[in-house]
Amino acid sequence: MDARDIILRPVVTEKSMNLMDDKKYTFDVLVSATKTQVRNAIEEIFDVKVKNVNIMNVRGKEKRVGRYTGKTARRRKAIVTLTEDSNDIKIFNDNKEN
């Protein structure tokens, strides 16, 4: 499996943006991905050294359309911590609004 198939997209929330200051980056990953696969994929794609990987499963939410109920797809998030001597991941511009 290719590394770009494992990492789906970065998670862009206020909390994940604040974690970037501590060299922690949040990504949506494949539901079947393991910590080792996520670590290897991040190191290959971004050319950084990974210190730790934390993974959490997010359940799908119930949604209604009229009288019909359904669920959104479940997903898996990975919070990747980089080593102190590693480079930052350049996902966005360095412009920060104050």
UniProtKB/Swiss-Prot annotation:
GO annotation, biological process: translation
SUPFAM superfamilies reported in the protein's UniProt record: Ribosomal proteins S24e, L23 and L15e (SSF54189)
Keywords, comma-separated and alphabetical: Ribonucleoprotein, Ribosomal protein, RNA-binding, rRNA-binding
Gene Ontology cellular-component annotations: ribonucleoprotein complex; ribosome
Gene3D superfamilies: 3.30.70.330
Pfam families given in the database record: Ribosomal_L23
Paired cysteines (S-S): none
GO molecular function, one term: rRNA binding
Top-rank taxon: Bacteria
Family matches, as NCBIfam families: PRK05738.2-4 (NF004363)
Entry function: One of the early assembly proteins it binds 23S rRNA. One of the proteins that surrounds the polypeptide exit tunnel on the outside of the ribosome. Forms the main docking site for trigger factor binding to the ribosome.
Family membership noted in the UniProt record: Belongs to the universal ribosomal protein uL23 family.
Subunit structure comment from the entry: Part of the 50S ribosomal subunit. Contacts protein L29, and trigger factor when it is bound to the ribosome.
Protein name as annotated: Large ribosomal subunit protein uL23
Lineage: Bacteria, Bacillati, Bacillota, Bacilli, Lactobacillales
Gene: rplW
